[in-house]
């Protein structure tokens, strides 16, 4: 999925785009873009005018008509090329995905109870609800849910990520994708999609653009462009009638030529944005694909650009996902070294990230090295949900660590004393957003291990940037309100939802939407599905359940919760690019007006030469220069349309001011300079 990332295009893509540019000359394809269809019709009209001029029926020189005709056809081809090069990126990605989509032999069974009764069938014949067995070395034949077993799966063909992932029955890691490969153990999978409707099929369809529909914003902009084009068409027709009247009044034989008026119409029509509009939308989808995010619709990308509420999971997005030991706090005058030694002993067999961090902290702070856990006199007590403690029996002593209330009951049951000091330390750590683990030896409390949520580096700056953009961030966590408040304050989020439930998340999203906000969120579990279905931008993790993926309108193939921030940036960049190029395109008309209008009427009204502020060489050179610029600017802006306008984390007001300056004022100045340069060049080489 990361193919061509960061590249404008390669030779193969350019070659295919050139070929497609000519294929797109069919009337059916041209009619899909009304603005460029006008240029297409104009090209046909001038071609006919040139043909009849060869037999003596003309209102301009044949060479002039031929020149305008060639430039108009080149303009149409450039517009086709812009769209084809954008589509080419998607086709290149689709080709790599098709390579992963192979018809393989599937081992179908009737039920879990009859695992030995295997029927070999083609993966293309599998239906929703079928059960298959996939062993190490085999490709997963279809999308499904793991209903038995656990295995490492290579998903690089889909995600581009070489590291294998674990897929297992139950929980939020049960979804598997057809085209991935099992590299260890065995999975029993229930198929969840019909043939041709798999996740891979949807990906191919989306990246190729076959399933892409115009978004409401695109439709609204296209209506504006069509309206402007109709206005300019009426103006041009009126000018022709006016030129006939003026010619008769002045006693001049020839009014303005039809060819010149066609050139005027094409120059005044918003052809630049008309040619690039489709490319901008396709490129936005492509940038998401390059970020390993699959958008189910262009509407979702646009919504991401308008989002003003971001609901972010604490774990994995704001924090690293694992709490780490950061301090040993002894009580009852216990030596800190003794507490660290006991805490490390109780954690030697603890393979959780928290347990390993205790071992590391004791080593770093006191130089206490881990002992051999295979010593015969060590009996490790594993953590269970029932006991809420873990520990070790060692040298006739019982060392335990766990939740405060559990350890308190343990100590008191053995005739020990649980001090008020320990309660105060536990409360203080909880208020800071940390997790206290109390450590006891036999019937004596030694102290507390402070486990802290580690805030990801740089998230405070990211949230500050989002705030500048007018986006409110809300942290979603299952922690208690005190812990949630402390972490939210440290991370710099605007608000939080503590002890979050599926119902609570859904209610919060609805409340914001009623107030007119657009909400984005991420999720991976079945319990996230209702909220994902309600959110305007819903990013489901690829590692998540099938229900979550179906509820979301985007799927993150990397399963990175922080990707939501990048998605919002891409959405805003898409909207900015479209707006900036629209502004530039319309601003261009002013310069082209000063180039062509004096050239058209200077024969009838010599006084209009005062409007020739660019001092263009002649009427013909003015028209040629304007229409050549009109074609070249399309090609010049293709890289910007594909890469997008550079996005900055500033307020909408500042962005608008900057873009009006760059693309509004720039859209006026650039054509004045370019048209003058073209006029000098074509005059120097004798074209006119």
UniProtKB/Swiss-Prot annotation:
<dbReference type="GO" id="GO:0005886">
    <property type="term" value="C:plasma membrane"/>
</dbReference>
<feature type="transmembrane region" description="Helical">
    <location>
        <begin position="65"/>
        <end position="85"/>
    </location>
</feature>
<dbReference type="InterPro" id="IPR036412">
    <property type="entry name" value="HAD-like_sf"/>
</dbReference>
<dbReference type="InterPro" id="IPR023214">
    <property type="entry name" value="HAD_sf"/>
</dbReference>
<keyword id="KW-0812">Transmembrane</keyword>
<feature type="binding site">
    <location>
        <position position="350"/>
    </location>
    <ligand>
        <name>ATP</name>
    </ligand>
</feature>
<keyword id="KW-0460">Magnesium</keyword>
<comment type="similarity">
    <text>Belongs to the cation transport ATPase (P-type) (TC 3.A.3) family. Type IA subfamily.</text>
</comment>
<dbReference type="InterPro" id="IPR023298">
    <property type="entry name" value="ATPase_P-typ_TM_dom_sf"/>
</dbReference>
<feature type="binding site">
    <location>
        <position position="401"/>
    </location>
    <ligand>
        <name>ATP</name>
    </ligand>
</feature>
<feature type="transmembrane region" description="Helical">
    <location>
        <begin position="219"/>
        <end position="239"/>
    </location>
</feature>
<keyword id="KW-1003">Cell membrane</keyword>
<feature type="transmembrane region" description="Helical">
    <location>
        <begin position="622"/>
        <end position="642"/>
    </location>
</feature>
<keyword id="KW-0630">Potassium</keyword>
<dbReference type="GO" id="GO:0008556">
    <property type="term" value="F:P-type potassium transmembrane transporter activity"/>
</dbReference>
<dbReference type="InterPro" id="IPR001757">
    <property type="entry name" value="P_typ_ATPase"/>
</dbReference>
<comment type="subunit">
    <text>The system is composed of three essential subunits: KdpA, KdpB and KdpC.</text>
</comment>
<feature type="binding site">
    <location>
        <begin position="383"/>
        <end position="390"/>
    </location>
    <ligand>
        <name>ATP</name>
    </ligand>
</feature>
<feature type="transmembrane region" description="Helical">
    <location>
        <begin position="594"/>
        <end position="614"/>
    </location>
</feature>
<comment type="function">
    <text>Part of the high-affinity ATP-driven potassium transport (or Kdp) system, which catalyzes the hydrolysis of ATP coupled with the electrogenic transport of potassium into the cytoplasm. This subunit is responsible for energy coupling to the transport system and for the release of the potassium ions to the cytoplasm.</text>
</comment>
<keyword id="KW-0472">Membrane</keyword>
<dbReference type="Pfam" id="PF00122">
    <property type="entry name" value="E1-E2_ATPase"/>
</dbReference>
<keyword id="KW-0813">Transport</keyword>
<keyword id="KW-0597">Phosphoprotein</keyword>
<feature type="binding site">
    <location>
        <position position="524"/>
    </location>
    <ligand>
        <name>Mg(2+)</name>
    </ligand>
</feature>
<protein>
    <recommendedName>
        <fullName>Potassium-transporting ATPase ATP-binding subunit</fullName>
        <ecNumber>7.2.2.6</ecNumber>
    </recommendedName>
</protein>
<dbReference type="InterPro" id="IPR018303">
    <property type="entry name" value="ATPase_P-typ_P_site"/>
</dbReference>
<dbReference type="InterPro" id="IPR044492">
    <property type="entry name" value="P_typ_ATPase_HD_dom"/>
</dbReference>
<keyword id="KW-0633">Potassium transport</keyword>
<dbReference type="GO" id="GO:0016887">
    <property type="term" value="F:ATP hydrolysis activity"/>
</dbReference>
<feature type="transmembrane region" description="Helical">
    <location>
        <begin position="37"/>
        <end position="57"/>
    </location>
</feature>
<dbReference type="InterPro" id="IPR006391">
    <property type="entry name" value="P-type_ATPase_bsu_IA"/>
</dbReference>
<dbReference type="GO" id="GO:0000287">
    <property type="term" value="F:magnesium ion binding"/>
</dbReference>
<keyword id="KW-1278">Translocase</keyword>
<feature type="binding site">
    <location>
        <position position="354"/>
    </location>
    <ligand>
        <name>ATP</name>
    </ligand>
</feature>
<feature type="active site" description="4-aspartylphosphate intermediate">
    <location>
        <position position="313"/>
    </location>
</feature>
<dbReference type="InterPro" id="IPR023299">
    <property type="entry name" value="ATPase_P-typ_cyto_dom_N"/>
</dbReference>
<dbReference type="InterPro" id="IPR008250">
    <property type="entry name" value="ATPase_P-typ_transduc_dom_A_sf"/>
</dbReference>
<feature type="transmembrane region" description="Helical">
    <location>
        <begin position="262"/>
        <end position="282"/>
    </location>
</feature>
<feature type="transmembrane region" description="Helical">
    <location>
        <begin position="668"/>
        <end position="688"/>
    </location>
</feature>
<keyword id="KW-0406">Ion transport</keyword>
<keyword id="KW-0479">Metal-binding</keyword>
């Amino acid at each position: 999925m990361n193919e061509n990332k960061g590249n404008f295009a390669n030779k193969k893509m350019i070659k295919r785009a050139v070929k497609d540019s000519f294929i797109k000359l069919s009337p059916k394809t041209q009619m899909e873009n009304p603005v460029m269809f006008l240029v297409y019709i104009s090209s046909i009209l001038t071609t006919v005018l040139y043909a009849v001029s060869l037999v003596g029926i003309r209102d301009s020189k044949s060479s002039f008509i031929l020149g305008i005709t060639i430039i108009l056809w080149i303009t149409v081809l450039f517009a086709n090329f812009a769209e084809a090069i954008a589509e080419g990126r998607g086709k290149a990605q689709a080709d790599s995905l098709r390579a992963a989509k192979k018809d393989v032999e599937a081992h179908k069974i009737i039920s879990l109870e009859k695992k030995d009764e295997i029927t070999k069938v083609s993966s293309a014949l599998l239906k929703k609800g079928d059960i298959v067995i996939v062993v190490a070395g085999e490709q997963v034949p279809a999308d499904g849910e793991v209903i038995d077993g656990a295995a490492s799966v290579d998903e690089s063909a889909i995600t581009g990520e070489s590291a294998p992932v674990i897929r297992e029955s139950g929980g939020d890691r049960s979804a598997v994708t057809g085209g991935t490969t099992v590299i260890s153990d065995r999975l029993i999978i229930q198929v969840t999609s019909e043939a041709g409707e798999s996740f891979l099929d949807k990906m191919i369809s989306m990246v190729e653009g076959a399933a892409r529909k115009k978004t409401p914003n695109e439709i609204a902009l296209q209506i504006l462009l069509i309206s402007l084009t109709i206005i300019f068409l009426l103006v041009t027709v009126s000018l022709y009638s006016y030129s006939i009247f003026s010619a008769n009044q002045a006693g001049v034989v020839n009014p303005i030529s039809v060819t010149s008026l066609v050139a005027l119409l094409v120059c005044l029509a918003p052809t630049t944005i008309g040619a690039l509009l489709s490319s901008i939308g396709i490129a936005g989808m492509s940038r998401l694909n390059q970020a390993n995010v699959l958008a189910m619709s262009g509407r979702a990308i646009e919504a991401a650009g308008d989002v003003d509420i971001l609901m972010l999971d604490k774990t994995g997005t704001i924090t690293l996902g694992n709490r780490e030991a950061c301090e040993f706090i002894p009580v009852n005058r216990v030596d800190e070294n003794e507490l660290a030694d006991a805490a490390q002993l109780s954690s030697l067999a603890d393979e959780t990230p928290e347990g390993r961090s205790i071992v590391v902290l004791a080593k770093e702070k006191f130089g206490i090295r881990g002992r051999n856990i295979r010593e015969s006199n060590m009996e490790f007590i594993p953590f269970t949900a029932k006991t809420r403690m873990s520990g070790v029996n060692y040298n006739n002593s019982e060392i335990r660590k766990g939740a405060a209330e559990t350890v308190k009951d343990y100590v008191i049951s053995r005739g020990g004393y649980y001090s008020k000091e320990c309660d105060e330390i536990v409360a203080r750590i909880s208020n800071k957003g940390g997790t206290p683990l109390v450590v006891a030896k036999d019937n004596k409390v030694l102290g507390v291990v402070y486990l802290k949520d580690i805030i990801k580096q740089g998230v405070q700056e990211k949230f500050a940037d989002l705030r500048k953009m007018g986006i409110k961030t809300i942290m979603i966590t299952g922690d208690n309100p005190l812990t949630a408040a402390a972490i939210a304050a440290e991370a710099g989020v605007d608000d939080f939802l503590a002890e979050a439930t599926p119902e609570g998340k859904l209610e919060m999203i609805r409340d914001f939407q009623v107030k007119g906000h657009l909400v984005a969120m991420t999720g991976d579990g079945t319990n996230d599905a209702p909220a994902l279905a309600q959110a305007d931008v819903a990013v489901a993790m690829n590692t998540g359940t099938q229900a979550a993926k179906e509820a979301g309108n985007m799927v993150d193939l990397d399963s990175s919760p922080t990707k939501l921030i990048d998605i919002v940036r891409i959405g805003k960049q898409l909207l900015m690019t479209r707006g900036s190029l629209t502004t530039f395109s319309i601003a261009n008309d002013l310069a082209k007006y000063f180039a062509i209008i004096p050239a058209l009427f200077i024969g009838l009204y010599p006084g209009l030469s005062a409007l020739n502020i660019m001092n263009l060489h002649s009427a013909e050179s003015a028209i040629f220069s304007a229409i050549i610029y009109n074609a070249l600017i399309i090609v010049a802006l293709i890289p910007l349309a594909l890469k997008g306008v550079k996005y900055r984390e500033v307020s909408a007001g500042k962005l608008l001011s900057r873009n009006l300056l760059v693309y509004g004022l720039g859209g006026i100045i650039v054509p004045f300079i370019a048209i003058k340069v073209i006029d000098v060049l074509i005059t120097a080489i004798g074209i006119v």
